[in-house]
A protein has these predicted regions:
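Basic, Lys/Arg- and aromatic-enriched nucleic-acid-binding interface segment
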Residues: 23-56
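Conserved tyrosine-mediated DNA breakage-rejoining catalytic core shared by Y-recombinases
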Residues: 61-99
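Active-site-proximal segment of tyrosine recombinases
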Residues: 58-59, 137, 147, 154-168, ...
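Active-site/catalytic core of tyrosine-dependent DNA strand-transfer enzymes
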Residues: 28, 92-136
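C-terminal secondary-structure termini that scaffold catalytic or DNA-interacting sites
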Residues: 1-11, 19, 190-199
Length: 199
């Protein structure tokens, strides 16, 4: 089994020792139904956040020319990112990729932001979702959920780190800790005859 060695220096500083929250499968279904009812630009940006794991600010600053089709995969080119984490990443979720590409294809390519929406407005929609549904939610929770879902699918932690634009592998590990990992392949099978009490 391949392993990734994380040294103590890789772990993020000043992070409280508590488990990172992520959206449950039920909450994700509610979230998807909710954003499908938003206006096209808001709908597309939230699908992008869910399907790519990018930061809110990164999504808000994308131009139409930053979204490209490579083969049958949709990629976003993130520039001037936090901590110098510029990167070109795919939209992992198929439905998200189709929605974002359709939205982008219907727009005229110019120098304006792709979604014509500010970071503050996106966060405002997130607040409305939380108030309407009663689900504890903020935009960054989508990055946590993205990391957890990829980890559950067996994507290497170093790949998740690149997709999220993390400087530290330890930060990625912190995000991915809410993954529901199936440990059954690694569990020993005991011989019940050796442990059952005698009659």
């Amino acid at each position: 089994m391949d392993s990734v060695i994380i040294s103590p220096g890789d772990y993020p500083k000043n992070v409280k020792n508590r488990r990172i929250k992520r959206l449950t499968n039920e909450e994700l279904q509610i979230f998807k139904s909710y954003i499908d009812g938003l206006q096209p630009n808001a709908r597309a940006v939230f699908w992008l956040l869910y399907g790519s794991g990018c930061r809110v600010g990164e999504a808000a600053h994308l131009r139409a020319s930053d979204v490209t089709l490579r083969g049958k995969a949709v990629y976003i080119d993130i520039k001037d990112a936090k901590w110098g984490s510029d990167r070109c990443i795919p939209i992992i979720d198929k439905q998200a990729a189709e929605i974002v590409w359709k939205y982008r294809a219907e727009l005229e390519i110019d120098n304006r932001p792709l979604f014509r929406i500010s970071k503050r407005t996106i966060q405002g929609y997130a607040t409305q979702f939380a108030q309407t549904t009663g689900i504890s939610f903020h935009c960054h929770l989508l990055r946590h959920t993205f990391a957890a879902l990829l980890t559950e699918r067996g994507v290497p932690l170093t790949t998740v780190q690149y997709l999220l634009g993390h400087k530290s592998l330890g930060m990625t590990a912190h995000y991915a800790q809410s993954a529901l990992v199936d440990m059954s392949p690694f569990l020993p099978e005991i011989n019940l005859k050796n442990v059952e009490g005698e009659d």
